[in-house]
């Protein structure tokens, strides 16, 4: 029997096809709390906390943009319950009722990927997260609280 297929070439084509597939993102589907819009910013707020987020990618701090979650397609002329006002990393988490708000809500509102597989389009490396200096494996499921200091570290693997 003659093998008319070069198995090595077939494997290379399969690898190329896998490499060309778009990355899936945790932000592809909005967390239900991410769809909630604040139309009135007043004293009736039952929840108003400020955790701080720092993102370090391969040793370089990544700037979190100002006005993330403000005046978006989902919330025109309004704010999402998780948003920023400046690029300091201070997250504003506000709502008319108290809720357990996971970190993924902010990333979904921002339109960025984050979980144990990576952050943004960085995948295949190591993701670590600390909360107030203590390692956490909760990643996107971490519940936000006032004055938390959340630091996400991404380190590329060799050859990435």
Language model features with spans:
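Ubiquitin-like/PB1-type beta-grasp interaction modules and other compact soluble beta-rich domains
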Residues: 1-160
């Amino acid at each position: 029997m003659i093998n008319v297929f070069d198995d090595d070439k077939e494997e290379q084509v399969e690898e190329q096809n896998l490499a060309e597939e778009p990355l899936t993102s945790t932000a592809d589907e909005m967390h239900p709390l991410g769809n909630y819009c604040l139309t009135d910013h007043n004293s009736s707020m039952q929840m108003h906390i400020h955790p701080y987020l720092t993102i370090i990618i391969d040793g370089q701090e990544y700037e979190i943009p100002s006005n993330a979650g403000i005046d978006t397609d989902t919330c025109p002329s309004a704010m999402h319950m998780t948003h920023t006002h400046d690029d300091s990393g201070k997250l504003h988490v506000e709502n008319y009722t108290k809720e357990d708000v996971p970190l993924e809500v902010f990333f979904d509102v921002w339109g960025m990927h984050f979980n144990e597989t990576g952050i943004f389009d960085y995948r295949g490396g190591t993701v670590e997260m600390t909360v107030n200096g203590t390692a956490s494996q909760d990643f996107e499921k971490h519940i936000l609280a006032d004055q938390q200091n959340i630091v996400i570290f991404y380190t590329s693997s060799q050859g990435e």
